[in-house]
Amino acid sequence: ALNHQLPDRLPLDFIWPRRETLQALQLHFQADSAEGVFRELGIDFRWIPILACYPKFQMRVNGRLEGDAPGAGNEYVFHDPRTFEDQWGIVFRVGADGKYLEWKDGPLRREHALEDWSVPEVVYPPIEQISRRLESYQNYVTVTEIEFPFKLAWHLCGLEDFLMSMVSNPGMVEALYDKLYAFQTEKSVLGARAGYDVIAVVGDVAGQTSMMFSPDLFERFDVPRLTSLVAQVKRANPETKVLYHSDGNMEAIIPSLIRCGIDILNPIQSACMDPAAIKARYGDLLTFHGTISVQDTIPNGTVEDVRDEVTTRIKTVGYNGGFIISPENSIPYDAPLENVLTLFKTAREFDYSSF
């Protein structure tokens, strides 16, 4: 599928499952781990982080995030029981429902702060150690992810301030992006050299109806640097693919992403774009990943709705290969378990010989 050849069956992924969803599935399957759930569902991908150490940050850590919010189980610098700081100095607050995080502050909100700021000191494991860990997943597609610099930048600066700077202070944006892209390129190349199958570049640049900023700004700030990142990954390991993730309607930059060398596009959010039309337009140039609605069908639809969407998506996006089916993003924690099971059962049982 990744090489645009018709596979013997449809590849499956289960992107960013929430803790509550995994717990419900473990109970359903009587599985003792998330890995057991993935095997029961027939998932072909394994998202495996590169376990980096941030020495200066680690000296300040004073607690572990508990509960069900993203990042639960990780260590942070807590300002109060619900507010914490990560290794980049970005401050988040656990929402009132305990399920989601809210951005609160970043270290570059002050004027001229960039002059005194540098990326965090990081120590990665030896490449041999990373490669040995991947050996346990030889029968799966292995993925590690990096944060897209736009996402990191607005978390550091504040969204409104950073969007304004893209127009009013492009020199600052260039300087910040040089630092962020260099940091993420180093990690990406390490992952490729260690043997990861896919490097996922993750960060939203669009809302429901349009881009968060002009495609011309993406062309100016991101295209040269993203092209370099992808090229360095390919030099390190020609077999490694690069996936780009952005929710929302980001169709305006798809041609730019293709020119950058992106191999896989996720999630083709069906509430914002037409997956069949995107396949028809770009299917010879990109592999598509995702497309199953976590805004509507999975949380709110019937089992039949889920079955119909999965079948339609396979028929309209899965022809000629180049398609990996997955939820578009994390499935909401209160989505019916039957719908989650139906998604993967329908995909597994689809008769691919009909193509």
What are these regions (language model features)?
Residues Q23, L27-R64:
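Segments that shape or occlude catalytic/ligand-binding pockets
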Residues F57-P120, N139-Y140:
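A contiguous, low-structure linker/loop signature
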Residues L12, I43, W47-P49, P70-E75:
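Secondary-structure transition motif
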Residues A1-S33, E85, V94, G98, ...:
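Active-site loop segments of alpha/beta catalytic cores
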